[in-house]
Structure formats: structure tokens, C-alpha cells
């Protein structure tokens, strides 16, 4: 059963030369995560973070210098909450600082990746969106009761993530989670979702 935090994103028609639905690439110490948040994309992201982390630590030791940060550029409409949390935890475990950059749009489960960065940047014309989780579910009445309990646990976790890594007051957080409203860079800076507008 897939749990999505928000609506499942519809895929745009493929263009000539487009061989993958996920777009994750590495250039020097930069990772470009231009993808939905799903198991495959987050697995690939986690591997790329681990690879760059190992290279950065080795480089730092060989040159006896400070470890350079990994720069993670995010353009994502979100997706699967569990996959998003897995990548969030990978970022938090990294021995190398990871600077996150909102590059156009970070929504839903992708915001978990954004808000836990060591330093968080957002381009001035970008947007973020947070909202409550949603699920696709089928089962018996007892299954629904269990699902409600599971969803309550996940919502509590989502709120705790924002409480720990942003400055959004709980009353405001409860209000915005009920809606699908974009926040511009200035609003994200005001509520501590990012540290700097670039």
C-alpha cells in the first residue's frame, strides 16, 4: 500500500530522449533532485548522498582541509511520505554538511528534505507547499480503524518535523496543513523553513 502526502503527481508525457521519470544528477559536489518523492528516486538520492559524503571526507583528509558541503538542489512536487522520511534521515545522518536549495518548487514530502539541511537556501521566485497527508486505502471496517490510527501517528510525526526544523507556530501549522496553499520565499524565510533567499 502506497501512502502519499498529497495527491499522486501525474507524469508529464515523455519527450524525445527522456528515458527516466526521475531526474537525479550529480555535478561536482551538487546533487540535482528534480523528481517526485518515491522509493526508487529516494533510494538513488540516498546512494548519491553517501557517495558524495565518502568523496568529501576523503578529499578533506587528503588535503587536510575543512569538508566541503554537499549542495542538494530540490525541485519536487512531493510524493511518498515514507520515502521522503528515509531521505530526510539520510541527510540528517550525513557526516558532511548538506546545504539544501529550493530550486523552483519543494512541496509535500519534498519539504522534509529541504527543512533539515545544514543551511537552507531558496531562490526568490520559488515556492514551498505543506499540507496534510492523504492515503489510498481499501479494506474492512477494522482495517479502517487501524489505518486511522496509523495516519494519526504519521501526522504527529509530520508536525514534529516542522516543529523541530522550522519556526512555524503549532496553531499556524495546524491551519496550513488543512490547505494546499503555496508559500513564497519571503513567507518561508519568515517561518524559518529556509535560512536565506538567493
Regions found by a protein language model. Give the residues of each.
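Terminal-region recognition feature
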Residues: 1-198
Amino acid at each position: 500500500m502506497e501512502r502519499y502526502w498529497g495527491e499522486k503527481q501525474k507524469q508529464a508525457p515523455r519527450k524525445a530522449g527522456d528515458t527516466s521519470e526521475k531526474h537525479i544528477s550529480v555535478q561536482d559536489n551538487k546533487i540535482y533532485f528534480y523528481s517526485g518523492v518515491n522509493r526508487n528516486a529516494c533510494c538513488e538520492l540516498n546512494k548519491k548522498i553517501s557517495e558524495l559524503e565518502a568523496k568529501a571526507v576523503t578529499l578533506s583528509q587528503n588535503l587536510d582541509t575543512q569538508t566541503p558541503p554537499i549542495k542538494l538542489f530540490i525541485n519536487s512536487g512531493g510524493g511518498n511520505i515514507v520515502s521522503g522520511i528515509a531521505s530526510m534521515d539520510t541527510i540528517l545522518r550525513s557526516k558532511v554538511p548538506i546545504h539544501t536549495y529550493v530550486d523552483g518548487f519543494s512541496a509535500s514530502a519534498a519539504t522534509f528534505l529541504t527543512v533539515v539541511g545544514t543551511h537552507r537556501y531558496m531562490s526568490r521566485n520559488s515556492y514551498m507547499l505543506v499540507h496534510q497527508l492523504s492515503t489510498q486505502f481499501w479494506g474492512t471496517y477494522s482495517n479502517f480503524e487501524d489505518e486511522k490510527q496509523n495516519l494519526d501517528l504519521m501526522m504527529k510525526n509530520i508536525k514534529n518535523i516542522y516543529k523541530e526544523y522550522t519556526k512555524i507556530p503549532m496553531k499556524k501549522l495546524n491551519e496550513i496543513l488543512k490547505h494546499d496553499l503555496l508559500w513564497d520565499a519571503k513567507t518561508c524565510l519568515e517561518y524559518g523553513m529556509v535560512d536565506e533567499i538567493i
